Design a protein with these regions (language model features):
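A short, Lys/Arg-rich alpha-helix, primarily the initiator
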Residues: 1-14
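The alpha-helix within a helix-turn-helix
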Residues: 11, 22, 53
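Short, flexible helical or helix-coil boundary motifs
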Residues: 14, 18, 59-64
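Short alpha-helical "recognition helix" segments of helix-turn-helix
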Residues: 19-25
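DNA-recognition alpha helix
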Residues: 25-26, 56
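Recognition helix of helix-turn-helix/homeodomain-like DNA-binding domains
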Residues: 27-43
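DNA major-groove recognition helix of helix-turn-helix/homeodomain DNA-binding modules
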Residues: 45-63
Length: 66
């Protein structure tokens, strides 16, 4: 899987909105929307995948501790 495909998979599995993804990867909502829709060849990078993954893994760890 490419980094872009991995991000799309996470978005689908966690049912994330563009604004939540944007916050996790430190990008604007419009940039995130363009990348999600693959407009003009815009795709998520490896760094953005890592940021998104780490952001939500940390949240899940906090839930697990409860």
């Amino acid at each position: 899987m490419t980094p872009h495909e991995k991000v799309i998979y996470i978005i689908q599995q966690l049912e994330l909105s563009d604004s939540k993804v944007a916050r996790a990867i430190s990008k604007s909502k419009s940039t995130t929307t363009h990348k999600r829709m693959n407009l003009r060849g815009a795709k998520f990078s490896e760094e953005e995948f890592t940021n998104l993954r780490d952001f939500y893994i940390e949240k899940l760890r906090k839930i697990e501790i409860l």
